[in-house]
Amino acid sequence: SVVELGKMIIQETGKSPFPSYTSYGCFCGGGERGPPLDATDRCCLAHSCCYDTLPDCSPKTDRYKYKRENGEIICENSTSCKKRICECDKAVAVCLRKNLNTYNKKYTYYPNFWCKGDIEKC
């Protein structure tokens, strides 16, 4: 769910998801128009694509359990849906951490109508 995703983002990046990622670029926090603006925005596109592979799941509301061992996120076995949601969320949190060096504050609260052009395919 968004609760676990938020915790993962804080743990991986040290940034609060709101406002750092909830309206960043063209893909973080929804919107999904135009090409990604940078590597951080591309992480959010990949996360959206991952969720698209889970049509029978409810990634924003299904709660799941995970733990951290030696700094790594470990998704705990529960239902197939919850495990797959957790893996999608883990991937985006790790991606955001790996791309902290290119995080650009000017893309926070980026107006969606500026996102033009073809959407990059998954």
Curated annotation (Swiss-Prot):
It is found in: Secreted. Transmembrane segments: none annotated. GO terms for biological process: arachidonate secretion; lipid catabolic process; negative regulation of T cell proliferation; phospholipid metabolic process. Keywords: Disulfide bond, Secreted. SUPFAM superfamilies: Phospholipase A2, PLA2 (SSF48619). It comes from the Eukaryota. Its main location: secreted. Expressed by the venom gland. Suramin inhibits the myotoxic activity. The keyword Secreted applies. GO terms for cellular component: extracellular region. GO terms for molecular function: calcium ion binding; calcium-dependent phospholipase A2 activity; phospholipid binding. Residues 105-117 are annotated as: Important for membrane-damaging activities in eukaryotes and bacteria. Pfam families: Phospholip_A2_1. SMART domains: PA2c. Disulfide bonds join C26-C115, C28-C44, C43-C95, C49-C122, C50-C88, C57-C81, C75-C86. Snake venom phospholipase A2 homolog that lacks enzymatic activity. Shows high myotoxin activities and displays edema-inducing activities. Belongs to the phospholipase A2 family. Group II subfamily. S49 sub-subfamily. This is Basic phospholipase A2 homolog ecarpholin S.
